[in-house]
């Protein structure tokens, strides 16, 4: 089975295409953009725009559609930052193609950007290093938030199953027990 055939089995092919386009677009533009033009500022701006689009898309669309997770950050009345995690219904079907691509790219992209940071440091390309630090911070933030969100969702599912089981047994014992 070819890669294209596997990707076409996605539950959300449009979300998958945009997820891959933004994520890989930023990487390829950074690595190969200067082969097509010598304008570093143009490449810098283009990569930052692709990174911002990728960050927003992963955070708000791709994560929700592909793996049923979403996160955001709120400021409380006291001014402290609060992370909020949202998970889809545990009964919802998560397509294995969507899930594998999402998690591999979510964790793979920061690793690639860190490798590019080391390379930029070794080549003394400090302006490129600034761009790579922006990329690392955005991709690591999404990876960290989705890792927490996934753990939060799994913990809630376990608590829900345990409490649901206890509640159903308690209900059977009190209400149904009277009629039997």
Curated annotation (Swiss-Prot):
One GO cellular component term of this record is: Golgi membrane
Indicate the transmembrane segments per the record.
13-35, 40-58, 101-121, 126-146
Keyword hit for Hydrolase: no
Record-stated family: Belongs to the TVP23 family.
Q: Does the keyword Membrane apply?
A: yes
Query: Gene for this protein?
Result: TVP23
* The protein's name in its UniProt record: Golgi apparatus membrane protein TVP23
Primary place of residence? Golgi
Q: How does it sit in the membrane?
A: Multi-pass membrane protein
* Localization: Golgi apparatus membrane
């Amino acid at each position: 089975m070819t890669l294209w055939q596997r990707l076409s089995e996605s539950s959300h092919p449009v979300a998958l295409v945009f997820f891959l386009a933004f994520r890989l677009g930023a990487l390829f533009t950074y690595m190969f953009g200067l082969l097509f033009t010598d304008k570093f500022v143009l490449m810098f701006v283009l990569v930052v725009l692709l990174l911002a689009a990728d960050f927003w898309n992963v955070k708000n669309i791709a994560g929700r559609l592909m793996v049923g997770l979403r996160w955001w950050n709120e400021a409380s009345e006291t001014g402290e930052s609060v992370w909020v995690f949202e998970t889809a219904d545990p009964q919802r079907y998560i397509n294995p193609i969507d899930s594998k691509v999402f998690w591999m790219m979510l964790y793979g992209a920061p690793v690639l950007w860190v490798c590019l940071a080391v390379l930029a440091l070794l080549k003394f390309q400090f302006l490129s290093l600034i761009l790579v630090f922006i990329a690392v911070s955005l991709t690591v933030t999404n990876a960290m938030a989705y890792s927490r969100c996934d753990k939060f969702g799994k913990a809630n599912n376990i608590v829900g199953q345990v409490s649901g089981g206890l509640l159903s047994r308690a209900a059977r014992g009190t209400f149904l027990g009277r009629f039997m």
